[in-house]
Amino acid sequence: MNIIDFFELSAGEWFSQRTIHNLVSGELQAGKSEVNVEILEKTDPTLINLCEQNQVDSSVTKLIGVKISWNGTNNKGQVKDVGSRMLIIIPNFDDLNQGQLLQNRGNGNSPKISGRYIMGSDDVLMLTTESEGLYVEERFWYLIPNLRLRTSVVNRPQGFSLASFCSEIRRVKS
């Protein structure tokens, strides 16, 4: 599987359950979300805007734009978690399995976040991003086409660290 196949398989509606561990305090949180993954056209204004902010030509053939939206709760339903982010995947010219990652939250006017991706020979996607003192490493993989797993580790200055595990089940329409 290459990066294009991975994101095409990701398109659709998902139910996500997650557990988040604060590695410093030991606090544990659980949450659930409805997640929608949409592949963007290269003519999408938000995609073009993020590309322009990063001096990237949005007409690059292999470029992939993805919008991820979620609506859920954390901590036994006490904290609402609603948002979206856009990812732009820019494969290396000579290797679709590695490349640059651009992302933002929401409407395209938020601070840009950049990083790298590697699509492993084991079909595990690893995203690494850094911005404003934040370092995030995420891993995604499919057990079957309708069941995706995700882990992440978030590190901030002053020793703040989180680790999470998510299982995501595709909503299949009858």
UniProtKB/Swiss-Prot annotation:
GO terms for molecular function: lyase activity. Keywords: Lyase. Pfam families: CpeS. It comes from the Bacteria. The gene is cpcS1. Covalently attaches a chromophore to Cys residue(s) of phycobiliproteins. InterPro entries: Calycin, CpcS/CpeS. Belongs to the CpcS/CpeS biliprotein lyase family. This is Chromophore lyase CpcS/CpeS 1. HAMAP family: Chrphore_lyase_CpxS. Its EC number is 4.-.-.-.
